[in-house]
Amino acid sequence: MVNKLWAGMCASSLLAVLAACGGHQPGTSATAASAAPPKATAADAAKFVAKVNADDKQLYPELTAANWVAENFITSDTQLLNAKGGERALTLQSQQIEQAKAFVGLADLAPEVARQLTLIKISSAIPPPSDPAQRAQLAALGTKLDGEYGAGKYCPPGKSGADCMNLDQLEQIIDHSRDPKALADAWAGWHSVGKPMREDYSKFAGLMNEGAKELGYHDVGELWRAGYDMSPADFANETERLWTQVQPLYEQLHCYVRGKLHDKYGDAVPANGLIPADLLGNMWAQQWGNIYDLVVPYKDAGSLDVSSVLQARHDALEKKELVAFRQSFAKAHPGKQPTVGDLDNVEHKVDTQYSIETAKIAEDFYTSIGLPPLPASFYEKSLLTRPRDRDVVCHASAWDMDQNGDVRIKMCIRPDEESLETIHHEMGHIYYFTMYNGQPFLYQQGAHDGFHEAIGDTITLSLTPQHLQKIGLVAKVSDDQKALINAQMKRALDKIAFLPFGKLIDQWRWKVFSGEISTADYNKGWWKLREQYQGIAPPVTRTEEDFDPGAKYHVPGNTPYTRYFLSFIIQFQFHKALCDAAGFKGPLYACDIYGNKDAGAKFMAMLKQGASEPWPDTLEKLTGTRQMDGSAIIEYFAPLMEYLKQQNQGKSCGWQLPDDPLAGPSSPTT
């Protein structure tokens, strides 16, 4: 991850578009849904649902195109258009929700009509208030917050303009540096982008709460928890149950990693305390794969350094293109030297070519199991590398532009393993889009939002060391126990390390929406949860002037995050089911479904359902069980768990919570 979590996927429903894409999308005035008749009947309800599907389907391409432009060309003009269009879209949504109330309680509704009426009510992460002025303010704030994140930069003291650093540049430091000062500076630099968002986010949350209350919910958090075919209270209990299943594995991993970091950094990492968040190889400490070299169990058991191979491929391509360019330039301009701009254009060309080649590696896996090739327009219209001439929202996302074959990915691919896995993840969204496009518009979303995030990650579980060797990304790998533990450690640093982070983001938001965390305590509440669940602390002292949640895209982008926690559980269930369908015999961690059409057929059958039925029905058809369950992830990592317990014998695992969550890793505890 391998920061795939990353993925603000654009779900294919007008309601979910407003939720999942950070997209308060613009558009021209929409055809208003027909008002419900005074004495509504089941037939009227069916006609109403059909019209909602038709109206939303007609409006969707324009909204999505406008949102694409707003995220790829961040200017005051595109933000204004985005906000105004978002206001119109929220108005249509508000009308549909209000009109749907006329059909509540009808006894003879067809099941598919009843389900779609429910989806109209709960599918949006941004419930619009009925007051037009509040809707306008909500749309404007959403657009502003999203744009501030995309344009965010850190200017070191005394620096400005071109010397300021964007997220990509700061991530290069966090991901690869081992200099504690450089790491702390980069971490604090990026987290400073959240500070200007704090007041706006408070207003934004308040306006969303107004909309949620009008729908009959206590707050937005309760509305979000209602979207899982169970009561909000039952869903909260379900996430806690799943966390309890996997928590022991996380705590063993934390204990082991903390010990290794203590060996590296000394007392900066307390032997039995919280880990500073900047030392884990990821800007948000959500996945720890970039510190694999510091914690690798057996250094003599072969290399799994995919990033070095990818970087070498990129460098070879760059060298080839530069030689060709210089030869061509010398012939055309004798005695002259190319400008910096000329060389920058060559570099951008190389980045684009490399990015396309990387995307084709991912596409090849999907087509090998029987899914169709992507249309040529995918490579023509996707943004796969950071432009040199403008700010963009580089956070990886997948887009279904028109529900008629125009699918795209927006992502700034880099030559490293993180980007390789992220493109596999995003392509999972793309194929989900294409598979459920035959469903009515309201069903064109995941069975639940965790399903959408799990599709591509299920595929990455087949990127075993043996598979990576076959495609030339690692040297010959051994199949002995040392090599197995190394491979499991590498994967656990992403898959297991992420689990508490995936849960706590929405724990914080739910508490904010309910008022349990007040505006005055935003940062305190944030770090209290990060310390409680992850066992990490801010590397530098924080205050309530800061707004560290704003440094994570999904908060200003308003993308619910529990989906990622769920996806990291169910992707192992999916993987196990597909391995069974493929006839694989062996340990789950060794399964690779590449090229297996039987597994692909079973996968496609699930993808085609979209949200047309309660998710337990969809899950049961693939896995044979109606319950999300952590047993597959525990089975997968059983060898590593045994190793970790052995290594942690005699250590004081776990951590105490500090008296002051904002004070950093060395603050007193009680």
What kind of region is each of these model predictions?
Residues 222, 226, 412, 433-458, ...:
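Post-HEXXH active-site segment of zinc metalloproteases
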